[in-house]
Amino acid sequence: MGRLQMLKHKNEPLTPGYHGFPTRDSQGNQEPTTTPDAMVQPFTTIPFPPPPQNGIPTEYGVPHTQDYAGQTSEHNLTLYGSTQAHGEQSSNSPSTQNGSLTTEGGAQTDGQQSQTQSSENSESKSTPKRLHVSNIPFRFRDPDLRQMFGQFGKILDVEIIFNERGSKGFGFVTFENSADADRAREKLHGTVVEGRKIEVNNATARVMTNKKMVTPYANGWKLSPVVGAVYGPELYAASSFQADVSLGNDAAVPLSGRGGINTYIPLIIPGFPYPTAATTAAAFRGAHLRGRGRTVYGAVRAVPPAAIPAYPGVVYQDGFYGADLYGGYAAYRYAQPATATAATAAAAAAAAYSDGYGRVYTADPYHALAPAASYGVGAVASLYRGGYSRFAPY
């Protein structure tokens, strides 16, 4: 007993909270407390001290732990500030660098675009351009048009379109510089020149259609087989798809028919002498062409075949070709021999002649009638072909 009392007197009482032993609160809280190791907070970056745990007031915390925490918090504050500043600086520096790079890239892009636009503008300015000028005065010629447009820039070419009657009222002007062409178009479009309001537009490329060319024949015709069979049946008597015509091959050409079959078509063209006999030609022109259209009407006529006696006394009553018949068939249809006089030829033709269809025409009182020269198929056709038409476009 005495020894224990001595120990009690020698040892100082434990200071609550000094050695890490928590004190009992006045209410008698018997909850177990955590050890000092568990109370030590790890290294954190928050600037404020840790909150109290398990109801322990902050003023009774462990002193060295508080010092360490204070140092840590102070250090953390310093580090946090420096880190934040450094982070902001570091975060700002890449953005600044990126911004500078972006600015430089944008400037470079703008420079490239401006350079490209300038090059395009220079190319467009140096490209020639063609203008279409319409409704110009009919008396205008190329020098007049060049003088009108020459004030706006250098002109490479001037062309006014003409036909057989004169100017068609429009033309083309080609400028060396497209900018000059645009300026001329803006200034001159809609202006009145000698009472005519001219129109200036950009010329467009003409659309060319591929027309199917008709093969010209030896006599220069370009008729279709249907029309040609009416006006020249001797040219279309044999088809390339039919059997061979049994005439001499002296005046025939080989044509490749269907399936590679060669067909000989006799080329009996009016006005050309052939070595074939006159009787053969007459038979060819008259024997197998009964019921077809009449033979060729034109200035050049074939050699007349021999008269074939048949149906004497028949008068030709075709009203469509009557004018040609009554107007003097001998002078119109057949080329008479040079040895015969005109009177003899007229008398012989009026006495008896054939049209190549097996019909003989003898003298007729209507033959004495001589209508005006303007009547007839050939004359009327010549009027329409060569005459003036007020429906011409220009």
Swiss-Prot record:
One of its GO terms (biological process) is nervous system development. Pfam families: Fox-1_C, RRM_1. It comes from the Eukaryota. The modification Omega-N-methylarginine is found at residues 285, 385, 390. The modification Asymmetric dimethylarginine is found at residues 301, 333, 385, 390. The keyword NADP does not apply. Residues 105-125 have a biased composition (Low complexity). Residues 129-205 form the RRM domain. The record marks 130, 138-139, 163, 168, 172, 196, 206 as: Interaction with RNA. SMART domains: RRM. Residues 24-36, 83-103 have a biased composition (Polar residues). SUPFAM superfamilies: RNA-binding domain, RBD (SSF54928). GO terms for cellular component: cytoplasm; nucleus. Keywords: Cytoplasm, Methylation, mRNA processing, mRNA splicing, Nucleus, RNA-binding. InterPro entries: Fox-1_C_dom, FOX1_RRM, Nucleotide-bd_a/b_plait_sf, RBD_domain_sf, RBFOX1-3, RBFOX1-like, RRM_dom. The keyword Electron transport does not apply. Its main location: nucleus. Residues 1-70, 83-135 are annotated as: Disordered. One of its GO terms (molecular function) is transcription corepressor activity. RNA-binding protein that regulates alternative splicing events by binding to 5'-UGCAUGU-3' elements. Prevents binding of U2AF2 to the 3'-splice site. Regulates alternative splicing of tissue-specific exons and of differentially spliced exons during erythropoiesis. Seems to act as a coregulatory factor of ER-alpha. Together with RNA binding proteins RBPMS and MBNL1/2, activates vascular smooth muscle cells alternative splicing events. Interacts with ER-alpha N-terminal activation domain. Interacts with RBPMS; the interaction allows cooperative assembly of stable cell-specific alternative splicing regulatory complexes. This is RNA binding protein fox-1 homolog 2. It comes from Bos taurus (Bovine).
